[in-house]
Amino acid sequence: LALATVELQKMSEPKLAINEIFYSIQGESTWSGLPCAFVRLKGCPLRCHYCDTSYAFSEGLKRSVTSIVEEVSKLDTRLVEITGGEPLIQPHVHTLMEALLDKGYEVLIETSGERDISLCDKRIHRIVDIKTPASGAADSFLETNYDDLRLNDEVKFVIMNKDDFDWALETTKSQQLIGRVRAVHFSPVMEQAGNS
């Protein structure tokens, strides 16, 4: 009976569309080099030219928050990154954040800033990937998110060319990001062959 009750609770609790959960070494941000559990959520409204996770646009299964936390607990790390796609498009992502934080995990969320980041739990580390002009999604950033950036956050610009670099540098200066956030990252990406 107790097992049936637990299963009923799992069925009625909030669910998220999960693309994958995996263990790897953190490759970006100031946590680079550390073991990390990644929870990749399904879906993204953007179509950045350099996207390397387009499989997350449509592939994924609905899972309860409890089952996600249970799977993460089997991985040998206390660092978790919620990513996508764009994780903030799923309303129950906040329930997942809180569940992981309440279990004592250090939680990162990588977001494009296309949605309101102020709704995130204040204990979380937000990695805000501000889209540059060459991404094809530069107009997607919610301008009010600049006002909500804090020292717990990091900002990332994926740089495809010199114009992107200049734009990111100007944005860093005009938004006074240095000193307002934990770190600002300029991450170069190779352009398509023949366009360098």
Predicted regions and their residues:
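Short, charged low-complexity linear segments at domain edges
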Residues: 11-35
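N-terminal amphipathic/basic-hydrophobic helices that include classical n-h-c signal peptides
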Residues: 1-10
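Short amphipathic alpha-helical segments, especially helix-boundary/capping motifs
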Residues: 12-13, 44-46, 71-74, 143-147, ...
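Conserved AdoMet/S-adenosylmethionine-binding subsite of the radical SAM
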Residues: 88-196
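Generic structural signal for well-ordered alpha-helical scaffold segments
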Residues: 26, 69-73, 173
